[in-house]
């Protein structure tokens, strides 16, 4: 839904009359609040991909919003909680390194007082990536080896709110069936054979908390979860392994115009883990999958300065580490940081959009952002 804002900007550029209808009556600035709150129906969504791991690319999505945020806010008078609108969508995209994918999914709430939530989707992918080895060591002297994943993946998650709290418990299922092909010109003995079909199927519990004041660009509160997935041949997979994640994103306002965001994020994997499912250091400025091992952890700070009622500047800095093949103290620490800007594109909803430039150990990366950069 958030990326649907991009298509609104495109329409506004070619239709002055329509652009005028997106003017905020309070300050006359460009604002999409009414469009997002009242919009129902199918919405085409152009996408721009800027992830360094796959290169620049683009695509097109189609989003359907079944109920408006205004209706959800009215329902909050009964339930005591503002439930996100039910959203369904589909997307096709491609990037400059030959990666292609198509996916469809959605999220919706149901049950008495909207106590239940569902999130899920299914996708077909043909993805080209690089593997740098556990702890950066392939075992053959090469810096990295290219590989391709071609197949299907899907995930389903159901969450139940605990009483009238901001806490949820749930169950999640992840299924992946890929033909995995390694670059035949650069053999990696530890990853042989060069081509194989590998199926992963995992089920596990989730404990989640969400007290953010805004699900898009929060200014106070925190969101976090404890997740575990247990993969096994007994539920349709080829290998037996486990993955774990614990994360917390906290937002603290101070001095009226500033918001400090704090992120702690740790992941682990045990057992016969496929190399492409190993945890990795996930921070802006570092390509996804560049630093992988059995364990990975990240700490990140982000400071937002609301310089005007509409415009904000941000600065961020993070550090991460992947370890397991080496002891924690011996593994390299990866640092990355950068700066960006935001525009309050939907004042009534608190949605910011903008761009970041980040520098990691090896390269500088550019990111488009709608809402929070943390997932």
Across the structure, where does each feature detected by a protein language model lie?
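Bacterial N-terminal signal peptides
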Residues: 4-13
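Sec/Tat signal peptide C-region and signal peptidase I cleavage site
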Residues: 15-19
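Gram-negative/organellar outer-membrane beta-barrel architecture
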Residues: 34-42, 50-195, 199, 352, ...
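Transmembrane beta-strand segments that form the barrel wall of outer-membrane beta-barrel proteins
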Residues: 41-50, 83-96, 102-104, 222-234, ...
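Hydrophobic, lipid-facing positions within transmembrane beta-strands of outer-membrane proteins
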Residues: 42, 58-60, 100-104, 150-156, ...
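Flexible, surface-exposed loop regions and adjacent strand-edge segments
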Residues: 135-141, 185-193, 243-244, 267, ...
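C-terminal outer-membrane beta-barrel translocator/porin domains of Gram-negative envelope proteins
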Residues: 193-196, 201-324
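Predominantly the C-terminal beta-signal and adjacent terminal strand-loop region
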Residues: 207, 264, 327-334, 344-375
């Amino acid at each position: 839904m958030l990326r649907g804002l991009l298509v609104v900007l495109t329409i506004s550029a070619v239709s002055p009359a329509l652009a005028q209808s997106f003017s905020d009556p309070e300050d006359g600035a460009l604002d999409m609040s009414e469009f997002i709150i009242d919009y129902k129906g199918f919405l085409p969504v152009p996408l721009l991909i800027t992830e360094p791991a796959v290169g620049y690319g683009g695509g097109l999505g189609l989003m359907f919003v079944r109920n408006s945020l205004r209706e959800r806010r009215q329902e909050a008078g009964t339930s005591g909680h503002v439930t996100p609108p039910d959203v369904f969508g589909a997307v096709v995209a491609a990037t400059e390194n030959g990666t292609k994918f198509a996916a469809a999914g959605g999220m919706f709430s149901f049950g008495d007082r909207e106590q239940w939530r569902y999130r899920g989707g299914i996708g077909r992918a043909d993805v080209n990536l690089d593997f740098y080895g556990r702890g950066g060591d392939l075992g053959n002297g090469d810096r990295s080896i290219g590989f391709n994943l071609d197949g299907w993946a899907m995930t389903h998650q159901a969450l139940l709110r605990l009483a009238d709290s901001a806490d949820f418990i749930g169950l999640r299922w992840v299924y992946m069936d890929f033909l995995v092909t390694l670059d035949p010109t650069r053999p990696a003995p530890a990853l042989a054979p060069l081509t194989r079909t590998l199926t992963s199927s995992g089920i596990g519990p989730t404990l989640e908390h969400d007290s953010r004041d805004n699900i898009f660009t929060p200014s106070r509160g925190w969101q976090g979860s404890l997740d575990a997935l247990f993969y096994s041949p007994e539920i349709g997979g080829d290998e037996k392994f486990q993955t774990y994640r614990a994360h917390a994103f906290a937002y603290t306002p101070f001095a009226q115009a500033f918001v400090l965001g704090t992120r702690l994020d740790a992941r682990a994997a045990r057992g016969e883990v496929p190399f492409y499912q190993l945890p990795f250091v996930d921070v802006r400025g570092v390509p996804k999958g560049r630093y992988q091992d059995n364990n990975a952890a990240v700490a990140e700070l982000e400071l937002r300065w609301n310089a005007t009622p509409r415009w904000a500047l941000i600065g961020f800095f993070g550090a991460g580490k992947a370890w397991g093949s080496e002891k924690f103290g011996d593994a390299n620490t990866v640092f990355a940081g950068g700066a960006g800007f935001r525009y309050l594109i939907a004042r009534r909803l608190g949605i910011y959009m903008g761009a970041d430039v980040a520098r990691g150990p090896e390269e500088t990366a550019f990111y488009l952002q709608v809402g929070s950069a943390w997932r």
